[in-house]
Amino acid sequence: MAIKKLNNITLTPLQKQNRKKIQVWLYTILLLCFAIVLVGGATRLTGSGLSITEWKPIHGVIPPISINQWQEEFLKYQQIAQYKVLNRDMTLNAFKVIFWWEWGHRVLGRFVGLVALLGLVLFWVTKRIEKNIFLQLLTVPILIAMQGIIGWWMVASGLGQSNLTSVSQYRLAIHLIAACLVIIFVTYLSRGLAEYSEKPANQGVQHFAGWLVFLILVEIYFGALVAGLHAGKVYNTWPLMDGQILPDGLLNYDPVWLNFFENPLTVQFVHRCFSYFLFITAVIHALYVQKSVPHSAHAHRAIFLCIMIVMQAFLGIITLLHEVPISLGLIHQGGALVVLCFSVMHWRATKGAYRVVE
């Protein structure tokens, strides 16, 4: 039987075919995750996240149809603080707009969970999954289910007896980071099943690439705090913040550590500064990879990652200067996911393909 060798890993034609099919499934999940995060971003930017006040995992898929059903949903929304404080003049038609955003976000979440579960069952029944990756593939639908639970936990922070007019920024950040962890995991798995013509990089390059992924995730976390606190609406100037390098009020909250999570000014300041640190780290990484494995695909990817980080920072600046319109906010959020995905692909590629275990 003909065989194919990948980084000293020998594959039969059937194994190669199975890996490609699993990759297509994983990339489908990845694209759906991208869509969910972007719809979630639009849901947040349009103030739609609290429009559905109940969690019905099964029959919640069916939206209101009759006028009475719509009135019932609207009445439930009228009981929460967001309506009482911000939207007392909202009409039923205006409510329908925010309802559809949240409904679409939830239905997409259920759909990606279904795709993940059914795909896993299909590949398992047809014996296409190699033993050494079965548990990792099983983890995908589990992570997606957990993300759904975290999503409801986030929404619940703005319901009931809460006096919040939006969800908790802490829970929003956790929800986004959990989504990013799903994206990281799926990307890492799919790239591990790819074909590589170049040998793996040394341990130093591999570890550095992994740390870069972590730093990008930290920057996304601070971006989520910016979103949750609406911190992009303040100090819409660059490179200075209201004409200052260190603006007044950075440490106004007591205790001091609270400023880094609840002070909009401080959170935006940290998000800005960490982006500069991230770029410098990416440049050092590119130089290190070029020195370790000169003129290799690893080095080329590291350079391209630097370019992507600069482009993402530029997008962030434009978004800030325009006071975060929905379109630019979504483009900036989508750009962050693209940078994250590419960094994970780069990290996984430095390791080579998964070994075959019969």
Swiss-Prot record:
Its cofactor is heme b. It is a multi-pass membrane protein. It catalyses: Fe(II)-heme o + 2 A + H2O = Fe(II)-heme a + 2 AH2. The chain crosses the membrane at residues 22-42, 107-127, 133-153, 172-192, 208-228, 269-289, 302-322, 324-344. The keyword Cell wall biogenesis/degradation does not apply. Its EC number is 1.17.99.9. Signal peptide: none annotated. InterPro entries: COX15/CtaA_fam, HemeA_Synthase_type2. GO terms for biological process: heme A biosynthetic process. Pathway: Porphyrin-containing compound metabolism; heme A biosynthesis; heme A from heme O: step 1/1. Pfam families: COX15-CtaA. Keywords: Cell membrane, Heme biosynthesis, Iron, Membrane, Metal-binding, Oxidoreductase, Transmembrane, Transmembrane helix. Heme binds at residues 271, 332. One of its GO terms (cellular component) is plasma membrane. It is found in: Cell membrane. It is an enzyme of class 1 (oxidoreductase). GO terms for molecular function: metal ion binding; oxidoreductase activity, acting on NAD(P)H, heme protein as acceptor. It comes from the Bacteria. Belongs to the COX15/CtaA family. Type 2 subfamily. Interacts with CtaB. Catalyzes the conversion of heme O to heme A by two successive hydroxylations of the methyl group at C8. The first hydroxylation forms heme I, the second hydroxylation results in an unstable dihydroxymethyl group, which spontaneously dehydrates, resulting in the formyl group of heme A. This is Heme A synthase. It comes from Bartonella bacilliformis (strain ATCC 35685 / KC583 / Herrer 020/F12,63).
